[in-house]
Amino acid sequence: VIIGDIMELHHKKHHATYTNNLNAAEEKLAAAHAEGDIGGMIALQPALKFNGGGFINHCIFWTNLSPQGGGVPEGDLADAINRDFGSFDSFKTTLTAATVAIQGSGWGWLGFDPKTHHLKIATCVNQDPLQATTGMVPLFGIDV
């Protein structure tokens, strides 16, 4: 259970900050590109990665939430979790262990690996986006 006030703060402060900072970095990137300033474009990469990742990660995060809670997966997702983790309980244990091990900020993810066609647990530091850093498609994310 997540308290509504915490989610409101998270949305209005954290996600909004990533969005605003990404927009500012994109404007600077466009200006640097127009001026042919390759050094300026390269210098913006950390801001684009951090704020772009924060924006993407939180957009995915919001789609994972439900006022009534999600409950136990059903259908194809449940079948894939059982195939790749043995059971839903085993999946939760694996995901919990991975996210608890993150030092500082980061994300715990359930992702689909298009190379193996299996679900995997992955963690990313700070705001690194799952797909851009691992090639996996994010299905469910936990902001740590």
Curated annotation (Swiss-Prot):
Function field: Destroys superoxide anion radicals which are normally produced within the cells and which are toxic to biological systems.
Catalyses which reaction(s): 2 superoxide + 2 H(+) = H2O2 + O2
Subcellular location: Mitochondrion matrix
Named cofactor requirement(s): Mn(2+)
Alphabetic keyword roster: Manganese, Metal-binding, Mitochondrion, Oxidoreductase
GO-annotated cellular components: mitochondrial matrix
Bound cofactor: record note: Binds 1 Mn(2+) ion per subunit.
Pfam families recorded: Sod_Fe_C, Sod_Fe_N
EC numbers, comma separated: 1.15.1.1
Assembly and binders: Homotetramer.
Protein name as catalogued: Superoxide dismutase [Mn], mitochondrial
Organism: Apostichopus californicus
GO-annotated molecular function: manganese ion binding; superoxide dismutase activity
Family recorded in the similarity comment: Belongs to the iron/manganese superoxide dismutase family.
Residues that, per the record, bind Mn(2+): H10, H58, D143
